[in-house]
Amino acid sequence: MRECLEADEMIELNRFLFEQTFHKLRASNSLDKVLVVSQDDQALDFARLNGGIALQENAESSLNAAVAQALQFIMTTGPGRVLILPADLPYMTAEDLEALLTRETAERAMVIVPDTRQLGTNAILLSNANMLKPQFGRRSFQKHIRQATSSGAELIVWLNENIQQDLDTPQDFSFYNKIILQPTHIMKE
């Protein structure tokens, strides 16, 4: 993405995507709470001001460490389902989110939504916070599948084109820019 955008544009895009995703999560009737873990004070303030829970990410943390920190925090607040979702899912709708939240069935279940290339992981729904050791990054989809099957959890791989489309590559951004940021207006003659 750094090939497509200047640093300040990246910050602006990330903030827009975060706020868009946050509002979709808060609007869901199927979620009790929205937890944001971040090192960004503005993101944490936004979460607090909009009814979310803000958790200061440990210094110099990786994505996996931040997710593990969030899962640990959730385990201290009591049992329950957990949805792990990045902010770079601009095509996800409220309907997609609700459909995902109805997928879990077993007492120990893991629902995984891969990216379009089925290499990365774009969403994970867990029946318990203690079921996952986060392994985001290269080939995370396969790693999370292995983790689910080796733990004896019911594994559900759910393919949803809107949740699968993220903004990880310059090609992803180019498509997003054409479709969302610069829509074409078609007029009937």
Question: Where on the chain are the PLM-derived regions?
Answer:
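Short, glycine-/small-residue-rich phosphate/pyrophosphate-handling segment
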Residues: 126-148
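Glycine-rich N-terminal loop/short-helix segment of MobA-like nucleotidyltransferase
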Residues: 1-12
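Short phosphate-binding loop-to-helix
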Residues: 48-81
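Conserved alpha/beta core of the MobA/IspD/sugar-nucleotide pyrophosphorylase nucleotidyltransferase superfamily
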Residues: 139, 146-189
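A short, N-terminal amphipathic alpha-helix
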Residues: 14-30
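Short aromatic-hydrophobic micro-motifs that form the base-stacking/packing surface
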Residues: 83-85
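Conserved donor-nucleotide/metal-binding helix-loop-beta segment in metal-dependent transferases, i.e.
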Residues: 92-118
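Acidic donor-binding segment of Leloir-type glycosyltransferases
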Residues: 29-54
